Amino acid sequence: MKRNYFSILFAFLTPLLLHSVYGQCEGVTLESLSIPGPFSVAALDEEDGIRNGPDYNGATIYYPTNGIPPYASIAIVPGFTAGPSSVEAWGPFYASHGIVTIIIGTNSPIDFPEARAYALLDALETIKQENIRSASPLLGDLNLEQLAVSGWSMGGGGAQRAAVLDPTIAGVIALCPWLPNPDFDHNSAALIFSGQDDTVAPPSLHADLHYEATPVSTNKLLFEVENGDHSVANSPTGGDYSVGKIALSWLKLYVEQNDCYCPLLTDNLLVDPPAASKVEQDFICELLANNSPELALNYYPNPTQDRVYFEIFQELNFELYSPYGQRLQSGQLSSSQPYIDLSTYALGIYYLNIDNQVVKLIKTN
């Protein structure tokens, strides 16, 4: 499995900035990728005043009613002969996590991928119009630099093609895509789901080739669901819910540009995932790592099985964080208790904020 991660951490951080960074990530956990998410959801269609673009046939926009704008957006198109209901589950799911979602029908049920690509671009135009339509509940609430596309089967091939046609698209989610002889020269972060037992778009003839056809300079991920069929990614519940968790993390990371989701992917969801028969990955994201100025205090041992001791001459406040930015403990180091105890935590990397600096601590067995 290819893993290409860029690690960075805040040289010359102020305490305020450090607290801000960790505070933003504190609520980003596997549990936070729930179905549904934290926000209530409402829907709009043409009867509510949204446009019906010339390159698609009918749409529903799902949006959060109590989220925090501005929102990212994603357009989704179904597959060959299929209607919007085939991918409908994605709308409320994304919207409940703060991502406005437009799901469209096609002018013809037998439209090929290129037509579906233009349908997706037209759907994004409808999203843009909602940001300025005076009667829209989304007036002024959309971040038009955070746009993504998705599609099932031929719609998945169309989503990749849409990214070629419009380089401003930030992300692609291809659901068991179908498109022979792919040409995907684009820079949009591409997540490709496939089903191991898909007989309509066999991965070896489609998804695998799509991954290879996506440039090496583009962030990309291929997740093949074990025993999955052609519709295994039509819902966020696919692959024992791993499909939804990975898709949401991908959009949060690359479309919303929220680096808190990097370790959810790199340290958990993509580490020997039980739902996957194959994972290929070549993407860069920012992890919390240790490039701070070297701590003036001596500390040992590191790695450790339990305690890390510090040679201190005055009382110092500390905060210990997980790789996900969750604060695990806080307290004070002193001459009577000059150590951090990791014995109750799982094996792995932890980050200690002490004396306005960050120390990476490693627990081993």
Language-model segments: what does each one mean?
Residues 70-79:
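Short beta-strand element of the alpha/beta-hydrolase
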Residues 24-69:
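N-terminal cap/lid segment of alpha/beta-hydrolase-fold proteins
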Residues 69, 114-157:
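Gly/Ser-rich "nucleophile elbow"/oxyanion-hole loop immediately N-terminal to the catalytic nucleophile
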Residues 289-319, 335-340:
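Glycine-centered coil/turn sites that cap beta-strands in beta-rich domains
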Residues 3, 347-365:
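C-terminal tail/sorting-segment detector
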Residues 85-105:
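Short amphipathic alpha-helix adjacent to the substrate-entry channel of hydrolases
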Residues 185-249, 253, 257-258:
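Active-site-adjacent alpha-helix of alpha/beta-hydrolase-fold enzymes
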Residues 277-300, 365:
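Residue-level detector of functionally pivotal "anchor" positions at catalytic/ligand-binding pockets or at interdomain
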